[in-house]
Amino acid sequence: LLRARIKSIQSRLERVRNQREQSRRARRRAELPVLSLVGYTNAGKSTLFNRITTSEVYAADKLFATLDPTLARVDIEHLGPVLFADTVGFISDLPTTLVESFKATLEETADASLLLHVVDVSANNRDELMADVEAVLGEIQADGLPQLVVFNKLDLLEQTPRILRNESGTPTAVYLSAVTGEGVDLLF
């Protein structure tokens, strides 16, 4: 009975992978850049996705509020059309029974043009959470993709939105609040 159930689940996962691969091929043919929101669970990815895309995907302060990647096309001044992808929140020490289904969901991320690594700036353990996300990105071969860190929930710290740049002037991080919208314009 258990073997049959496992086989059924593996078969469904394979169908999902195939469907997503077909979708990825279609997006590549359309040549639209994909900006993928990644980050630890409850970092505010869906709230930021909704703010940028004017969508209304479910956003809640709980585990697995987002279970499937959501895509939305947005026309950005100076860039043109892009696809934004909202992804499932990462968690550490994921039970082995869930690893395969999460990998199937997160494989979309490996095809992104840019990762927007959303971090809850108010979290006391944010460095640890960022490291957990980086580890998962490595597991799905997405750790070599261009990345911009988005420190979200700035409204909880009463700080000013800003951009951090490296020595050559390239943006490396943006501080903003997806809830209030402050600093979101700095992304573009």
Predicted regions and their residues:
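Conserved GTPase G-domain signal focused on the G5
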Residues: 5, 9, 44-45, 156-160, ...
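Glycine-rich beta-strand-to-loop/alpha-helix junction loops that act as flexible
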Residues: 86, 176-177
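Structured loop/turn residues at secondary-structure junctions
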Residues: 40, 121-122, 179
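Conserved C-terminal guanine-recognition region of P-loop GTPase G domains, centered on the G4
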Residues: 76-81, 94, 102-175
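Conserved G1/Walker A P-loop phosphate-binding module
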Residues: 1-114
